[in-house]
Amino acid sequence: MIETSKRSRIINKINNVVISDYKGAIFVWGPKSTGKYTTIKHVLESNSRIYCEADCNEHYSTASLFRSLLSTLRNINKFGRRKPINYDDDDEYINNDINKDNEEDNNNNNNNNNNNNNNNNNNNNNNNNNNNDGYDDGYDDDYDYKDKSLNERIELLKINDLSKEFNNMIIKSQIYSKKIPATSIPSVSEMVQVLYEKASTNETISIILRHSEKLMKFEGEFFYSLFKIEEFTDHPVCLYLLSEIPTERILSTGKEFKPIRNIHFPQYEPNEICSIVLNFKPNFSIINYNQNNNDSNNSNNNNNNNNHLKLKEEDNIKLYNKLVELVVRVFHTTTRDIIDIIFVCHNLFPNYIEPIYNGTCGVEDSDSILYQNIESKIVKSLRNITEKDEIVLEDQKRQQETYQIYPPQQVPQQQKQQEKEKEKEKGRQLASYSDAKNIPYHMKIVLISCFLASSFSRNKDKLLYTKEAVKRQSLSNEKTTGSKWFHFQRAREIGYKLFPSEKKALFQESIFKSLASLKYLETISSIEPAFTYKFKCTRRVHLEFIKQISASINFKIDTYLEAAQFQIISK
């Protein structure tokens, strides 16, 4: 586990929770690929704790969720090795019988090691005589057990012991499967009791649930009951609810629930990503070996003996550090997944150092020559990361259909222009998707309130944001115009009404200025105070972009867009 300055504080928090044997639920939230699951798993395994895990995105009922928790229950040895908990830990009489049989087998082996070779020779002679006498090689029921050799007896004893263990495991698995049938809906207390029966321990069991926001779709009030898990059971249980959305956005505001402990994982900064990726360096010796083999093959084919440079390990480390910094600068706006960045760096490094092997540039030369060698591959890797698999498959099918109808040289010009326009639209959609994914949570709230303030006039504020019953009628012909100018104070009031649980400190002047610097908002410069400033949403803040932002924080913006089609009936 790689620790940074911010992660060390979070690890200390989780470590204190584990050491103090905390009982209850803990909500762990943060953006995607911030190390929530790996950090908790690392702390539990380092402290040798019993835990089980499940991904709520893969289950649609409590029965299937409880089955996956039961199958993933893990115990940690004193040596730090992870092992599954066996069903046969409680059956002492079977283990004692097996141990006794093993001791007898070991004694027989130690006493009769010198006679085994003689017995094997005698058996071979007897088998030859039996074959000559017409004896059948197949299994005979009348064949006496005493006439067998010691090795055959030992093998039969081991087979019998294994059959006992196998039968016992089948019986135990049937018992546990009867406790949680697929058709029933077990309660939380029943599930915890089954986990402790399987683990046969009095220590705390940790339960990790990823994508816990999906539990809101389960039957009944199951998600709210998890907050009171320590009240339902007498066994010590610590529940980790992992999500990318804060608790205030998941839970409904009308219900009362117990305040839950929160642990926030902030997003990785570019320097933190570099420090993590640099710990996963490729094998430089294999890369050098492959480069030398390719150079030798080319020299044999062309009859040229060029003097290729041999890089030292220090030079490889310096060049890899430069490549990682370059890749992180290019990729951190689209993705911050560390696994993707490591994969890209390992694939690009042999091509990155190819000009140095060829002798076209040195180790300490400018990076422009090295970057030109991998520029096309960086663009391809960016497309592979940002584009979804469905879009790639649709493009392949469309290209195959066009090439079957028209040869590559006879494609009409109109079709080429349409393809270029479609590619531009896809690029805009992908850019907006990446922007919506990387914007922080508090800026998303401000952008939603600014979009509503810029799209609709002040006359509709009472219709959209009031909680009182208002008479309204539909508009048959409504003229849709572009974004309008709005005051800072109006956007702040809309944000207070849409997100009452959030702190008022979020809607400050600094956030609006930062959005204006990022070209999400336009401003009118003035010497007056901030609350008299006027703002307007730019073209980057369009409807699809706002829908993606609202979906990421579980905010239903369609209800406000549908309500805007009406008008208040004047009394």
From Swiss-Prot:
Residues 90-142, 404-430 are annotated as: Disordered. It is found in: Nucleus. One of its GO terms (biological process) is DNA replication initiation. Pfam families: ORC5_C, ORC5_lid. InterPro entries: ORC5, ORC5_C, ORC5_lid, P-loop_NTPase. Residues 107-133, 407-416 have a biased composition (Low complexity). This is Origin recognition complex subunit 5. It comes from Dictyostelium discoideum.
